[in-house]
Structure formats: C-alpha cells, structure tokens
C-alpha cells in the first residue's frame, strides 16, 4: 500500500461542491509518471490550495471558491491512474491544463488540517504545498502522523 498527498485547486463557482469527483486524484498532461505507482487500496490526503487561477469559459472568466489552505479529506484509491481525454481547462492568462489522468477514490473522512499544522507534522517549516505535478508520496510514518492529527481536526 502507498500513501499520497494530492493538491487540488479550489472548485470553480460553476462546479458542484458535492461532485462525486471532487476528491479523486487528477494529474495534468505531462505529469502522469508521478502516478504510475497509484493502486487500489492506497490512501490519499486531499489538500486544497488557498487560491488558483480563474478559468476562461468562452469569453467569460469563472472565479473559484475561496480555498481552505488545508488538507480537507482522506480517501482510498479504488482504481489505478487511468487516461481519459478531456477538454483543456483554459486559465485566465491563456495557459491550458489537460487533466487527462485520474484515479477514482472513495472519501473516508472530511476534516480540516491547516497548512500550518501540516508543516509542523512534516517538520518542514517552509513547506508550501506547491507540490510539482500535484502529487507527493508520503512515508508510512508521515501518513500515520498526519492521520492522527487530521482525525482530530475540525469537521466541515
């Protein structure tokens, strides 16, 4: 079994808060090698950033909800990383992101563990959660320490 931390941008205002996919693992085109070792049964913490670029939909910009700058969920992977071609998300500056790689998960817990506490648990005072590719492998020890504190965290 592997343990992961994945980073999500806050939902756009036009996306449902309770969408089934909200706690899946998503990797953009070009970052899929990071997810080769993802398998069913793996555990993953979902971290939501404080902010992210707005999305361009046609000629209008769609804002994002305020981000929580916290781990917001713990999930279990139910299917390995798979490819599914999707339309690109066009960002406000014109850059495109294709979130073509995804691993389906089942949400186990939703609590809130702020970045400040995550830094203390990882013993990394400068940790920003700006994880290249949006996926970071955790050791069993790191996972256990985060889980212990996360389970005591604020409920949504």
What residue spans do the PLM features occupy?
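Aromatic- and Lys/Arg-enriched surface recognition patch
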Residues: 65-141
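Extended aliphatic helical segments
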Residues: 7-13, 44, 57, 62, ...
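Short, Lys/Arg- and Gly-enriched loop/turn segments at beta-strand edges
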Residues: 51-73
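Compositionally biased, charged N-terminal/linker segments
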Residues: 1-40, 45-58, 120-125, 137-138, ...
């Amino acid at each position: 079994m592997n343990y992961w931390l994945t980073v999500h941008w806050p939902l756009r205002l036009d996306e449902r808060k309770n969408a089934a996919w909200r706690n899946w693992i998503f990797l953009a085109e070009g970052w899929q090698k990071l997810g080769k070792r993802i398998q069913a049964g793996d555990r993953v913490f979902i971290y939501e950033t404080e902010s992210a670029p707005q999305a361009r939909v046609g000629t209008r910009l769609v804002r994002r909800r305020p981000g929580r700058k916290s781990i917001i969920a713990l999930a279990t992977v139910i299917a390995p990383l798979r490819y599914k071609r999707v339309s690109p998300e066009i960002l406000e500056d014109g850059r495109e992101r294709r979130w073509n790689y995804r691993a389906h998960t089942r949400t186990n817990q939703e609590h809130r563990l702020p970045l400040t506490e995550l830094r203390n648990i990882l013993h990394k005072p400068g940790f920003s959660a700006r994880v290249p590719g949006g996926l970071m492998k955790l050791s069993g020890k790191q996972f256990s320490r985060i889980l212990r504190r996360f389970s005591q965290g604020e409920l949504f």
